[in-house]
């Protein structure tokens, strides 16, 4: 991972799951991704659980009394106060007062104008977050029914370069780039869903190639995961979208199985 001083603005720098049942959530992700866990305290003295993999920090879990929430992705900023001001200026909402977590930095939750929640983080000097390895975060996609709003907001906030990789009509799938490197994607939600579905970020975690895609999927289902959409090929690897036993959606991905998903008529992997 890049150092704090060189981490590009707009780059994912943390992933956090608020959960109403910390114990069962730990059990599930331990069995599927091999995570271990340790407890820290934030600047207000509240306990905070950090997930590790072979000693490397890969995610955070936070006890939350309330309904099940999605994985929260945090994006790096250079100045949290200035970025929060820009969020409001560009049509978003700041949802809370900033918090400081040792080993991470100052962070705050926002809603973009399309209604999806995401975090901003000004990394601390001792910031540590491992991505791109088996069992860790390797990709994330914003799924929203209001794609133009999302593109404009995040483009203004982070200066993302944006490229449409689908036909833009039947399937609208845009990749966001930082300094020429693809970092995130935005997907238009299926507009024909029978019921309204809120916009959400889908965190993608890499499978262990020594275990394999199919075996990891079976482990997830045996541990209580629900299949949300059958496995599909993509330009970033073979993907399956699941929900954990409490209902939080996430994806497993095998980056070694890359295909051009738009060589044939595409299916919407987020069709609810």
Feature locations, PLM:
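DNA polymerase sliding clamps and clamp-related checkpoint/processivity subunits
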Residues: 53, 59-65, 73, 77, ...
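Short, surface-exposed, charge-dense and proline/glycine-enriched linear segments
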Residues: 68-76, 125-134, 154, 193-204, ...
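Short acidic, gly/pro-rich beta-turn/loop elements at beta-sheet edges
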Residues: 25-27, 61, 84-85, 150, ...
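Vicinal oxygen chelate
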Residues: 1-7, 11-20, 50, 63-86, 90-141, 164-182, 217-272, ...
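Core segments of cupin and vicinal oxygen chelate
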Residues: 2-9, 16-56, 89, 97-105, ...
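Short low-complexity stretches enriched in small and charged residues
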Residues: 28-32, 65-66, 96, 158-161, ...
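Conserved short beta-strand elements that form part of the metal-binding/catalytic scaffold
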Residues: 35-68, 113-124, 164-199, 208, ...
